[in-house]
From Swiss-Prot:
PANTHER family: CALMODULIN LIKE 3, MYOSIN LIGHT CHAIN 1, 3
A Gene Ontology cellular-component term: contractile vacuole
Keyword Cell cycle: yes
Listed name of the protein: Calmodulin
Function: Calmodulin mediates the control of a large number of enzymes, ion channels and other proteins by Ca(2+). Among the enzymes to be stimulated by the calmodulin-Ca(2+) complex are a number of protein kinases and phosphatases.
Residues where Ca(2+) 2 binds: D59, D61, N63, N65, E70
Domain of life per record: Eukaryota
Post-translation changes: The N-terminus is blocked. Trimethylation of Lys-118 observed in other calmodulins is absent here.
Amino acid sequence: MASQESLTEEQIAEFKEAFSLFDKDGDGSITTKELGTVMRSLGQNPTEAELQDMINEVDADGNGNIDFPEFLTMMARKMQDTDTEEEIREAFKVFDKDGNGYISAAELRHVMTSLGEKLTNEEVDEMIREADLDGDGQVNYDEFVKMMIVRN
């Protein structure tokens, strides 16, 4: 669970600014109506139910609105997710030796061997098969992400 403690003062100040953009009437909380207004101004078109779901996800005290501490928790969570995506992208680059956007059986075998994992050709092929959703014999970035998310 991400917490506000993981945020810097600078980030908190930025989020306070963003919060005030949402909090149109300045009462210290964001309603579904205010959330809808901001999202529509950003070109999104959420339904009332979607807006309510978004609020319910972070509405810790159950009052139907998002206050600033709840908003901070939501932003801290989002930032943690982004770190994870970045880590997965970096890991993919390690495997994708030739940088063509795919991990071949040979590349996978090379990395696993260099990590001290002595795998048989069958084991490497099996790993590729499990992750290779479109059946082209190699693993693309999207397939790699799905595999990493399932494992974590």
